[in-house]
Amino acid sequence: MTFTIQHFIALLPLLITSATLVVVMLAVAWKRNHSFTATLSVIGLNLALLSLLPVLGVTPIEVTPLVLVDNYACFYMALVLVSALACVTLAHAYMESYPGNREELYLLLLLATAGGLVLVSAQHLASLFIGLELLSVPVYGMVAYAFFNKRSLEAGIKYTVLSAAGSAFLLFGMALLYAESGTLGFAGLGAKVAEHVLSGPLVSVGVGMMLVGLGFKLSLVPFHLWTPDVYEGAPAPVSAFLATASKVAVFAVLLRLFQIAPAALDNQLLNISLSVIAVASILFGNLLALTQSNIKRLLGYSSIAHLGYLLVALIASKGMAVEAVGVYLATYVLTSLGAFGVITLMSTPYSGRDADALFEYRGLFWRRPVLTAVMTVMMLSLAGIPLTAGFIGKFYVIAVGVESHLWWLIGALVLGSAIGLYYYLRVMVTLFLVEPGIRQHDAPFNWGQRAGGIMLVAIALLAFFLGVYPQPLLEILQHSGLALAG
C-alpha cells in the first residue's frame, strides 16, 4: 500500500507522542532539569491532543492492516491523552522532593501513553498485543518508581510477575485462535464467527485464555488480586494513570473486538462466563471495599466494581451500548483523576509514603475546604448520585441493560451501587469530622495556585456541570459518530 499524507495525518497523535518521548530522552541525557522535562511532556501531550482535530478530517482511514483510525479511536485517544496530561501535571509537584532521579517517570509515562494510543486504534490481534505490552511494560517501572518504599517495590514485582503471566495467557490464546481461524484481523475473525466456522474446543480454550489475559489487565474478578496492593504501593500519580488511561485503552479495544464480531456473544458459554465475571466483579469489588481504611485500596476495589458495570454494556452490545461505554468511561476517567488528584496533592511533596490512610483525611474540611469540596464531588460522582457526571454514565449503562433484558445483571448493578454508596459516604463523612490532634499529611498551603490544584478544581466543576447538563458530552459522542468503521 502507498503511504499518503492522509495516513500521516491519521498517525499524528502517535507520532507527536513518540517525538516528545525522544526529545525528553535527549533533554535528560543533555542536562537533568525536572521542571523542563515536565514542561516538555505537557507541551507534547497538548500538541498530540490538538492534533486530533485534523485527524477527524481524514477518518475513518486504515493506516495499515494493523491500525484503523476512526472516530471511535479518536474519542478514546483523547481520553488516554487527557489522563496522561493530568498525571504529568500532578506528578510535577509530587516529585519535587523525590530523592532519586525524577525525569525518567515522564519517559515511562509517555511510552505507556504511546502504547495506549496504539491499543485503541488496533484492528488486529498483533497490534492489540504490541499496544498492550507497550502500555504495560513502562507501568512496571512506574509502579516501583518509589523503590525506597518497600510497598512500592513489592507492588512493582507483584504487578510485573502477574502481568507477564496475563500476557502469556493472552498470547497463547491468540495462537490457538489463529491455528483454528487462519486470521488475526478483527474483521476476519468477525466473518468467521458469523459463519459459525469457529466452534471447536481449541477456539473455546483460546478465547478463554484471551479472556484471562484481558481480565487481568482490567482487574476483573477473579483476576483482580493484584489491584489493591498495586494501587496502594504505586506513587499516587501512577495509581491515577493505572486507574484511567490503562483501563480505558484495554476496554476500548475489547469493545471494538466484540462490536466487529457481535455473533461471538451468541455463544452461550462465553455469554454466561462474561455475565458471571460481571456479577462477581460488581459484588466482590464493592463488598471488599467496605472494610478498607486505606483510600487507595478502597479506590482499587471500587475500580473492580466499575469495570463490572461496564461489562454489562459490553454484554448487551447493541443499541446504545457503544455510546453508553463512551459516556461511562469519560465520566469515570474524570472522577478517578479527581479522587487520585486529591490524594496526590495531600501527599505532595513526596515524603516516603502517600497520604492514603482514611484517618489522615479526618477534619480536612476545617483546613482545606475547597479541596474537601473537590473530594466530596468525586465521591458522589463515583457513587452515581444524581447531579454528578457519574450518574449519567450509570444511567446509560442501566438503560442499555434494560433494553437488552439483562435483568440479573441490572439487579447486581443496583445492589452493588447501594453497597458502594456506604463506603463513598464513609469517606465523605470523615472529611467533615473534628480534626485529630496529630496530623501527618496535609496539602501544601498554596495548592490552589499550582497547576495540579487548578486542574482539580476544574475537574470538580466539570463533573458537576456534566451531571446537571450532560448535553455537551452526549453531542461529542453523537457528532463523533461513536460507531465503529468497517
From Swiss-Prot:
Single Gene Ontology BP annotation: cellular response to antibiotic
| TM helices/strands, residue ranges | 8-28, 38-58, 73-93, 105-125, 128-148, 169-189, 196-216, 235-255, 269-289, 304-324, 325-345, 373-393, 405-427, 454-474
Classify the main location: membrane
EC number assigned by the record: 7.1.1.-
Reaction it catalyzes: a quinone + NADH + 5 H(+)(in) = a quinol + NAD(+) + 4 H(+)(out)
Q: Which UniProt keywords apply?
A: Cell inner membrane, Cell membrane, Membrane, NAD, Quinone, Translocase, Transmembrane, Transmembrane helix, Transport, Ubiquinone
Recorded GO molecular functions are:
NADH dehydrogenase (ubiquinone) activity; NADH:ubiquinone reductase (non-electrogenic) activity; quinone binding
* Pfam families noted in UniProt: Proton_antipo_M
Which cellular component appears as one GO term in the record?
plasma membrane
Where's it found, cell-wise? Cell inner membrane
**Protein's membrane topology:** Multi-pass membrane protein
Briefly state the protein's biological role: NDH-1 shuttles electrons from NADH, via FMN and iron-sulfur (Fe-S) centers, to quinones in the respiratory chain. The immediate electron acceptor for the enzyme in this species is believed to be ubiquinone. Couples the redox reaction to proton translocation (for every two electrons transferred, four hydrogen ions are translocated across the cytoplasmic membrane), and thus conserves the redox energy in a proton gradient.
PANTHER family (alphabetical): NADH DEHYDROGENASE
**Assembly behavior:** NDH-1 is composed of 13 different subunits. Subunits NuoA, H, J, K, L, M, N constitute the membrane sector of the complex.
Similarity remark: Belongs to the complex I subunit 2 family.
- Which named protein is this? NADH-quinone oxidoreductase subunit N
The protein's organism comes out as Pseudomonas aeruginosa (strain ATCC 15692 / DSM 22644 / CIP 104116 / JCM 14847 / LMG 12228 / 1C / PRS 101 / PAO1)
Which gene name belongs to this protein? nuoN
